[in-house]
Each structure stands twice: as structure tokens, then as C-alpha cells.
Amino acid sequence: MRIMFIGDIVGKIGRDAIETYIPQLKQKYKPTVTIVNAENAAHGKGLTEKIYKQLLRNGVDFMTMGNHTYGQREIYDFIDDAKRLVRPANFPDEAPGIGMRFIQINDIKLAVINLQGRAFMPDIDDPFKKADQLVREAQEQTPFIFVDFHAETTSEKYAMGWHLDGRASAVVGTHTHIQTADERILPKGTGYITDVGMTGFYDGILGINKTEVIERFITSLPQRHVVPNEGRSVLSGVVIDLDKEGKTKHIERILINDDHPFSTF
């Protein structure tokens, strides 16, 4: 089984990059399933139903979220019925949506779990205990278990990777929007990367205009974050190959921008 996961889609530039590159990436890598993190897809914050459907039309099979899950109020109207979407499972039980879903691809069932960290993030339920619970539940149905851990710090993400080594097929980090070069296979067979990176505006800061961010650092005054609709793009992702027992046998980063052009080789 081959999983292709694309990191945080930020705004229109990120969505356009998905539309442009997903067909080419599918032709090159031939993934069994394509998953994206969509928590910033609607102008940098949240997800609308229109964009959810657009991403599915553009070749995305499944979506994960993060701390901006409820950034667009309309998500309350469709998240419970969005069968190709998960939000962080360690949100309180009262939160709309669900944190683990299964996707069937031919004769393979894949569990997709979304978790959110707590270090320098909102104080929510324990992601480690929730991971234990959901992985146990998933293992009753499938050995193929994919985890998107949406978290701020390298240490918390690495801790989750080690915590789930041998139990989850892969643990990938999202949220910081900067791709890390530490992809590896942990000793018991779990594929891991601290952060997959983002898909969005290449010439800004974490997908937003740089001018306002720089001004805030200089003046310490609040600034409005502006997500541009035009500009050069970056696409960040990872391809993970799993064996028949659900263990990672290969993990490879994807990075496409003007400094790292797409190659069919």
C-alpha cells in the first residue's frame, strides 16, 4: 500500500497547487490513497463545504484537520456528514466531527487518525491517551493505521512517533508549515516525519504575506495576516510504502517549488 500525504493547504494558492500537481504526482507515484491536511484551505483558516468538495474532485481521497478546524462557521453544518474528513480526535467529545475514520481501497482498509498536540497549543484532551484508545480500536479492523499529529513542537511529535512505534503504520507531523528533513522508519516499523510542510504561497512566511509579519516583529503591534490569492507556490508532502503487515518499508519526501521543480523521475 502506498500513501501520499500532502501537508497543510493554505488558501487559494495551495488549492491551485493541489489542482495542478495532484494528477502529475499520482502519475509519478501511483498512490493507493491520497490524503491532505485541509485545516488552512479556506483562505488560511478552516474549510468550507465548497472547498471540501473541490479537493475531492481534484483527486484527494481523504482530509485531516487541526487547530483551525472550526475557522469557518459553516463547517458545523457539514462536518458530521463529511465521510472523507477527520478532525483532531482529542477535541472534547461535544465537538462536532470525528477523529478517526476508515477508508476502503479495494481489499485494503486504512484507518486515518487525526490528533492535536498540547505544547504551545490550546489545552485540550491528552493526545497520547486518545492515540492509545483509537489505535486499539483500529487494530481490531486493520493493520493499516495512519496518524496525522498536528502539533507545534518537535519534541511532542517525536514523542508521539516513538509512543506509537510498531502500532501505527505512520505518524506524520503537521502544523508548522516547514518541511523537516528527518523522515525515517522507527525500529518497530512506523514511518515518521516531524513535519510534512505546507502547500501554499512560497514567497511569504508560513503561507501569508511577509510584510505584515515582519512589521509585527519590528513593532510588536498586532497585524492582520493576509493570505494572498496569487503568487508562486510550494507543495510539500510525503510518500509512504507499507508492507502487508502495515509496517513502513519506504518513506520519501515531496517538495515542489521554483527552486525544486517537479520532476517525473
Predicted features and spans:
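Acidic, metal/ion-coordinating pockets
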Residues: 1-265
